[in-house]
Amino acid sequence: MATSDMTAEGPERHGRRPAAVLIAGPTASGKSALALKLAQASGGTVINTDSMQVYRDLRIITARPTPDEEALAPHRLYGTVDAAVNFSAGAYVEAAAAALAEVRAAGRLPILIGGTGLYFKALTRGLSAVPPVPAEVRDAVRLRLDRDGVQALHAELARQDPEAAARLAPADRTRIARALEVVLATGRPLADWHQQTSPPLLPPDDVVAVFLAPDREALYARIDSRFAAMLQGGALDEVAALAERQLDPLLPAMKAHGVPALIRHLRGEITLEEAASIGAADTRHYAKRQFTWFRHQLPEFKWVRPEEADAFLNTVIPGRA
């Protein structure tokens, strides 16, 4: 298995307490258990770094920590956002900055855990300075998307921002709409904004960063069994309550793994068994993409197998054995 060492000047090399511990990994890899164990052992606070677990409407289908688990150590940024909100990476960084300040003021160790690579990249590399898109521009683009279709929007993007149009898949509704919104609102292509970044909240040299990398086949089997357990635990009722709100299907919460398939089942389009199969398959594909993304985008994260987790814990906090 490919591994990568953390930066040579990281805090663990100097025997000092890190500014934070970052625990990433694919879905269902055991991140939450590792973070909770570390929080209990080190006096830490667990901070969510997952783009779907921020939504209060989706505790079960996103595998958020249970109330019993949350009672064992302080948790932050879980279930704090309504599903009607398009919660951006910029909004996350702002919320994370406040959470980090609170945790540090209390003298606790921040433990950031999740599978959203963009959030970790924004925290450790800085965030692109894309300004907020006015609501009227966003609404106009989405109206055109619904009325004219994604191909028409892609053609318009090719005229406004040829580089983005060439880079994006012609059927990628969300990213095409986003790129068009930015160029229409600012007069500048998205790539221009991406070249400008804010200072990172958590410079790589100040943190310990780990990526849990379990055996692929074992992970995929765990994903399948966990999705079945979610259904038994009330995921269908949770999604039904979300569907009743009739929110914009392009909102992030409406695209959480399993949600679209279960909504199709609730509409009578597919059976529950088919919905479960689709939801589990989508989650497996996402896990595969997480491996690839972190390997190429954040090589400074140290890759460890879950069974190496205890040894990892002993290296994080100086003096802990």
Swiss-Prot record:
Instruction: List cofactor names only.
Output: Mg(2+)
Pfam families found in the cross-reference section: IPPT
Q: Where is this site: Interaction with substrate tRNA?
A: T116, R138
GO BP term, pick one: tRNA modification
Q: Which reaction does it catalyse?
A: adenosine(37) in tRNA + dimethylallyl diphosphate = N(6)-dimethylallyladenosine(37) in tRNA + diphosphate
What does the subunit section of this Swiss-Prot or TrEMBL entry state? Monomer.
> So what family is this one in?
Belongs to the IPP transferase family.
This one is known as: tRNA dimethylallyltransferase
Species annotation = Rhodopseudomonas palustris (strain ATCC BAA-98 / CGA009)
At the highest ranks, the source species' classification is: Bacteria, Pseudomonadati, Pseudomonadota, Alphaproteobacteria, Hyphomicrobiales
